[in-house]
């Protein structure tokens, strides 16, 4: 297996979720061993995707460096992870990645348009070697060794529409596009009203978010799938795990996890070299195993 980038540049314009202003997003190819690099084109600031550059995880995963910030990176990164892209330049002219329809579907379509190009260098994959768990009250995220990437997520909301949902997702690009990519972000009307009162969620609408009142979904079209709520959490987790800098082989499990816990998990993995091994696809046996895991 070889490292990849996109075949040619692509771009789109969309609205930022919190500021509600138009944002131009440009994806450009990068050479081998460059990784995922964000760029604020309006400020001329480069923001490499590294755990130490994650500066906020309250409402979204936020990248920051030299007084420049880029918020809501997780949906795009989730698609990048699913497509196995190792090297990519992501430029925006404002401080948010466009929310689009609230899922990763638009970004999958954009990557399909860009095409995937193999580079000369061998692909690197992180294999988890021992279990790591992060807890906050009854909430937790955990990752442990496995020969593939799987995500097991459970959510439990005191709401009649959501209640308790669980989904076990074994990664493949096809399964991601069928089960996960279309799952939209969601929020509660009371929270949306509060966020707007403090100058946030200005770009949020029924076109890019599932909104719930006390008893029901306000979106007339309803849900895209029965487990859309928990599948969106899996979408987010795949984006947050991309901060590791490469695809990961491991069994991820979460109960009511969050961007904050995912970020803490990423940092905990990298804090001790005994937690992981970087596999380089140079010998046939490893290459076969990696191809099977990331089909």
UniProtKB/Swiss-Prot annotation:
EC number(s) recorded for this UniProt protein: 3.5.1.108
Gene3D superfamilies: lpxc deacetylase, domain 1, lpxc deacetylase, domain 2
Any one GO MF annotation of this record: metal ion binding
Record-annotated disulphide pairs: none
GO biological process, one term: lipid A biosynthetic process
Binding residue positions for Zn(2+): 75, 232, 236
InterPro entries named in the record: Ribosomal_Su5_D2-typ_SF, UDP-acyl_GlcNac_deAcase, UDP-acyl_GlcNac_deAcase_C, UDP-acyl_N-AcGlcN_deAcase_N
Gene Ontology CC: membrane
Known pathway: Glycolipid biosynthesis; lipid IV(A) biosynthesis; lipid IV(A) from (3R)-3-hydroxytetradecanoyl-[acyl-carrier-protein] and UDP-N-acetyl-alpha-D-glucosamine: step 2/6
Superkingdom of the source species: Bacteria
Cofactor: Zn(2+)
Active site: 259
Transmembrane spans: none
Catalytic activity as recorded in UniProt: a UDP-3-O-[(3R)-3-hydroxyacyl]-N-acetyl-alpha-D-glucosamine + H2O = a UDP-3-O-[(3R)-3-hydroxyacyl]-alpha-D-glucosamine + acetate
Keywords noted in UniProt: Hydrolase, Lipid A biosynthesis, Lipid biosynthesis, Lipid metabolism, Metal-binding, Zinc
Family label: Belongs to the LpxC family.
Function, in words: Catalyzes the hydrolysis of UDP-3-O-myristoyl-N-acetylglucosamine to form UDP-3-O-myristoylglucosamine and acetate, the committed step in lipid A biosynthesis.
Protein known as: UDP-3-O-acyl-N-acetylglucosamine deacetylase
Organism of origin: Helicobacter pylori (strain HPAG1)
Taxonomy of the source species: Bacteria, Pseudomonadati, Campylobacterota, Epsilonproteobacteria, Campylobacterales
């Amino acid at each position: 297996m070889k490292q990849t980038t996109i075949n040619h540049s692509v771009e789109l314009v969309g609205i930022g979720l919190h500021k509600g202003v138009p944002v131009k997003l440009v994806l450009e190819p990068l050479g081998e061993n460059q990784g995922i690099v964000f760029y604020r084109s309006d400020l001329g600031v480069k923001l490499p995707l590294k755990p130490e550059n994650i500066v906020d995880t309250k409402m979204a995963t936020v990248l920051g460096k030299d007084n420049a910030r880029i918020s809501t990176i997780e949906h795009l990164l989730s698609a990048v992870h699913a497509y196995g892209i190792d090297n990519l330049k992501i430029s925006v002219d404002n401080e948010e990645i466009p929310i689009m329809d609230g899922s990763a579907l638009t970004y999958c379509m954009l990557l399909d348009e860009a095409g995937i190009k193999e580079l000369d260098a061998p692909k690197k994959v992180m294999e988890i070697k021992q279990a790591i768990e992060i807890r906050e009250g009854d909430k937790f995220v955990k990752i442990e060794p496995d020969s593939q990437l799987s995500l097991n997520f459970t959510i439990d909301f005191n709401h009649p529409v959501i209640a308790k949902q669980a989904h076990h997702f074994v990664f493949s690009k096809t399964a991601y596009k069928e089960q996960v990519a279309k799952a939209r972000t969601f929020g509660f009307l009371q929270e949306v009203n509060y966020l707007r009162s403090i100058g946030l969620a200005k770009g949020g609408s029924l076109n890019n978010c599932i909104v719930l009142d006390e008893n029901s979904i306000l979106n007339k079209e309803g849900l895209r799938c029965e487990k859309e709520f928990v599948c969106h959490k899996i979408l987010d987790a795949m984006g947050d795990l991309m901060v590791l800098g490469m695809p990961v082989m491991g069994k991820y499990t979460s109960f009511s996890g969050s961007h904050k816990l995912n970020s803490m998990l990423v940092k905990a993995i990298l804090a001790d070299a005994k937690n992981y091994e970087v596999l380089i696809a140079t010998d046939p046996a490893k290459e076969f195993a990696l191809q099977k895991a990331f089909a």
